[in-house]
Amino acid sequence: MEVTCLLLLALIPFHCRGQGVYAPAQAQIVHAGQACVVKEDNISERVYTIRESDTLVLQCLVTGHPRPQVRWTKTAGSASDKFQETSVFNETLRIERIARTQGGRYYCKAENGVGVPAIKSIRVDVQYLDEPVLTVHQTVSDVRGNFYQEKTVFLRCTVSSNPPARFIWKRGSDTLSHSQDNGVDIYEPLYTQGETKVLKLKNLRPQDYASYTCQVSVRNVCGIPDKAITFQLTNTTAPPALKLSVNETLVVNPGENVTVQCLLTGGDPLPQLHWSHGPGPLPLGALAQGGTLSIPSVQARDSGYYNCTATNNVGNPAKKTVNLLVRSLKNATFQITPDMIKESENIQLGQDLKLSCHVDAVPQEKVNYQWFKNGKPARTSKRLLVTRNDPELPAVTSSLELIDLHFSDYGTYLCMASFPGSPVPDLSIEVNISSETVPPTISVPKGRAVVTVREGSPAELQCEVRGKPRPPVLWSRVDKEAALLPSGLALEETPDGKLRLESVSRDMSGTYRCQTARYNGFNVRPREAQVQLTVHFPPEVEPSSQDVRQALGRPVLLRCSLLRGSPQRIASAVWRFKGQLLPPPPVLPAAAVETPDHAELRLDALTRDSSGNYECSVSNDVGSATCLFQVSAKAYSPEFYFDTPNPTRSHKLSKNYSYVLQWTQREPDAVDPVLNYRLSIRQLNQHNAMVKAIPVRRVEKGQLLEYILTDLRVPHSYEIRLTPYTTFGAGDMASRIIHYTEPINLPSLSDNTCHFEDEKICGYTQDLTDNFDWTRQNALTQNPKRSPNTGPPTDISGTPEGYYMFIETSRPRELGDRARLVSPLYNASAKFYCVSFFYHMYGKHIGSLNLLVRSRNKGTLDTHAWSLSGNKGNVWQQAHVPINPSGPFQIIFEGVRGSGYLGDIAIDDVTLKKGECPRRQMDPNKVVVMPGSGAPRLSSLQLWGSMAIFLLALQR
């Protein structure tokens, strides 16, 4: 019955079978890149090892229907400093020149909406070996009461690698081992992870002054070669020592040229010098040459720490730092502090008053303050005190304190900051003290408490400050914790009380606080007010686009909903059909007025004329947004079934193949029933397509439909387009590319022929113990300079696209060289098998073609089953070889090179089947006649008659 079903499947071009083939996604990860090794640590742990800078290729093989969508994600590995995720929506993940930080666990997530998603993972281990670093440390200790000293040297070798490196220490060319003698010790320091090894030379002896090599190895994993570093230890080896040509703190005036020299005072080997600057890089124009640093025309922005570092891998690096200070004065501010003891916030006669002055200076401690009253220097007295460092204010702040304020103390006070003897200009600020000097108040102008603007427009928030003097206004946000102002600052100063915002966005909406500053005015509790900013923006609706399918004659309801907007309401809704304005929907009773958050349109019955694009434009008086509906009775696209087992079926003695195309119909009940499908078949790289109509009966959801594509040419690929048709007309088209793939040549009840058209060559492999390999080629890939008068011009089919396997016997091949092509391993399930194949042996130097059977029952044993030698003419001939393996076996085609270069041998169309070979062998000298060459064929009626008789015999 199984054979009957298979034959019926082949005879009937189309049929429907099965229900509910929808299946959840299944996934499996395989590698296809430059992997060193893939280890299976346990059932759930797979490790993919790859060398750094190689190409990572992972494939997620999926099954399930509909075809699952694949997404790759990654979590951080050991070399990554933080969690990271990358998404790749493709079945193949490819990373060129992979870096160590890209190691980690990769997840393949496959989902198709049926059941739960399938998630598989694999850990990618990136292997690398950096250059080792060797440092030398020396210690000297007193022994036996200072009678003599012991000198101990530590050679520390560090390397970054994965996997952990193996360390080999050498003195000269001799390898050192742990405790080799009393003077040598090798150990791993504490708190290291295998990346460091120390060679300790105790009580240094004359023979210890030598060349030492640290060789690191990862045991050639991934082909990574060993690396080494060498150090020459002498009795003059010493760490670096430095001194500077200037003081550690260097104060200069702006515009001067600065030169600092870093001088070596010791070190063997000769140390390397390096200049750096913090924070940031060296200034533009700065020149570091050896130990000399030059900065022309220095400016205030060039202030900072300049570091000179000397290294020679002996001891610790030597470092000297110069703190460069470029004199500058900026940001002069003052404060008026009423009598703090009496907690007063106003200036009153008879109470104390303090005026403070501060300037941001470099160097801060060198600034000099002077106070003036009404243009004359202020003189200290019992009632007028001047302090340089007020402990209640920022460092180096000068204060002038008036005790028991009198009317005569009113006037204009000026604070001047300077660097005596420096060309830096003085900086001054003045404050007027009078009966009109009052603390500030702040308020929001009338009508400005709420500011409403459209998104993208400028906005201005304003607070008015009254008082004398008027301090700056500081702005901040209130309603959002830790929120920053549009400028990126948490607090922004405005001199006129106006906060100007350019091109506001919706996230700028909220409450803003304005408050008085405690500088350049009264040093009292800040006064504050609030301004509300409202940003209006156009509405956002859903769905922005929706595909609505419905059968003809059924009602349709279209709804456009408001998601967000400011204001959050629908002011108007306008419907259009194919660009034409529709009349407003009928007015509903007051109790059923449509809610303000959506708009609806009802179609009583869908017709061909009412199918098309509908637009709903929703407005909130600020802007509008559109819902787009594509309404039709079109059928959804077919869903190709990709899990068909062995969809490709090749035909013996021809270069045609058939393909089993299977699919389901997506949501068949959503529209009118599918009447037929239109199938378009186009060979890739060609323009013409063949179109067929496939009638069907009522299609159920999940029902698997099938059609066998015949007369496809090996090894071409085809584009398949499938379109469903209903009473409405053509539905959505689905397309896919089908490729010819040869199955692994497993013996079965039916003949299974390998044409070598696929790169996988049916699972055949090249033997690793022979002298050279078989080559797969066709007439299009032949070497134009190949030897004439040998080898076939085409394969057995006579088409230029057809492939075959052959041995090239030109140089450097020699007499007796062997090439072996080994089949997959077969499990013997029958007593007899027959191996059929075509061979081509043409040329005066033809050697031998042998067929061997490799038995793997008890060990490995190769047995000769067939052999042929010499020139057999420029024709393809067929051989049938019976074999009777006793257990699992492989067949081997062995080509042996003859006495010269005119000895190419080819094979094609290898078939392995159960049972005995045909008793009547084909004449080995008879040319095989291919289809289309004029050979007689059975008519279709004769074929049907023979098949019918065969089916009746099977049923009996």
Swiss-Prot record:
SUPFAM superfamilies recorded: Concanavalin A-like lectins/glucanases (SSF49899), Fibronectin type III (SSF49265), Immunoglobulin (SSF48726)
Pfam family of the protein (one): Ig_3
Membrane topology of the entry: Lipid-anchor; GPI-anchor
Subcellular location: Cell membrane
Positions of glycan attachment: 42, 235, 247, 257, 307, 432
Segments forming a coiled coil: none
Annotated keywords: Cell membrane, Developmental protein, Differentiation, Disulfide bond, Glycoprotein, GPI-anchor, Immunoglobulin domain, Lipoprotein, Membrane, Neurogenesis, Repeat, Signal
Signal peptide stretch: 1-18
Official protein name in the record: MAM domain-containing glycosylphosphatidylinositol anchor protein 1
Organism of derivation: Mus musculus (Mouse)
Gene designation per UniProt: Mdga1
